[in-house]
Every structure is written in C-alpha cells, then in structure tokens.
Amino acid sequence: MTETREPTETGGYASLEEDDEDLSPEPDSEEEEEEEEEETTDDPEYDPGYKVKQRIGGGRGGPSRRAPRATQPAGPPAQPCQLCGRSALGEAPPGTPPCRLCCPATATQEAPGPESRALGEEEEEPSRTGETRPAGRDGDEDEEEGGTYHCTECEDSFDNLGELHGHFMLHARGEV
C-alpha cells in the first residue's frame, strides 16, 4: 500500500505515524505490560501448558527432578530402630544382635527367632513350641509358599512384615 506524504507547514514531510505517540519521552506503560507478559510465559504459574510441555519433552528441557539413585549422598549415620530401640548393624555393642528391622540382611543370615514372627503367629505358636520340629523347617515352608509379603519395588518375598519394612527402608535410602 502506498501513501502519499503531504508537505507540512515547515516544508518537511509528515511522519506516517502520529506525532503524539512518538514524540513523548516516556515509554508507554502498555508496551511494558506486553513485554512483561512475554517474559512470564515460561513461568509455570502463568503458562497453563507448562506441565504438558514438560511431560512431552518440550518446554525448558531441564534435567529430571528425580536424582539418580547412585548419586544420592549417603544419609546420616543409622539411627536406632524406632520400633524396638536396638542399634543398627555396626553400631550394636559386641555380643548384642542388631535389630532385624534396621538390618534385614542380618536377619536372613540368623536363624529365625520369636522376634521375627508376626503378631498373629505368636498367639498360635506357644502350643507348638514344645513339639520336636526343627527350627529351620519353618523357613523352608515359607520359601515354598513364596512368602506372604511382597516388595512393591522389586517383587521380593518376605516371611514377615518386619523384614519387608527393613527391605523397603533400604529402597528408600537407595541402598538396594
């Protein structure tokens, strides 16, 4: 589109834009607001599609929020078991067995004792304790059944809830 310029009173040509807007020394507040809106579209609060972009790989493309398990720093030293108060493996005084809930690896090496039974089993077992049944046989029966408790992270089977709890805590610390 061609426009003809008309000579102004001073003999020069008139600007194509209006003089009132261009000659003002102060910038328009409308232009600043538009610029601010453009800057805030990357902010998740202002961009409704931000989460969708993150899921499909668009957006900022930053690293995953989850840290890899291998790079997690080691936590504070092991605390005593919150259930029984015993020290964890390595911190137990000599001659004292460590807590089975804090250290399930130790629990699998030791023979099953009354501590490792579930609450319901303790009430039923006292009548059987006098019978001549080998202690190792109880564990063999559970292995054939595949255990009663299963880890949701790795599908391992455990005989009692305490062992499952200890195993799951190892997952939480990133040790398994």
From Swiss-Prot:
- Superkingdom is Eukaryota
What species does this protein belong to? Answer: Mus musculus (Mouse)
Chain residue ranges for the region called Disordered: 1-152
Note whether Cell cycle occurs among the keywords: no
Acidic residues bias: start-end ranges: 16-46
ZnF segments: C2H2-type: 149-171
Alphabetically list the UniProt keywords: Metal-binding, Phosphoprotein, Zinc, Zinc-finger
Could you tell me the gene encoding this protein?
A: Znf428
Cite the InterPro entries for this sequence: ZNF428 (IPR038977), Znf_C2H2_type (IPR013087)
> Basic and acidic residues: which segments have biased composition?
126-138
Disulfide-bonded cysteine pairs: these are none
An MF annotation (GO) of this entry? zinc ion binding
Q: Which residues carry this modification: Phosphothreonine?
A: 96
Name of the protein described by the UniProt record: Zinc finger protein 428
Question: Does the UniProt entry include the keyword Phosphoprotein?
Answer: yes
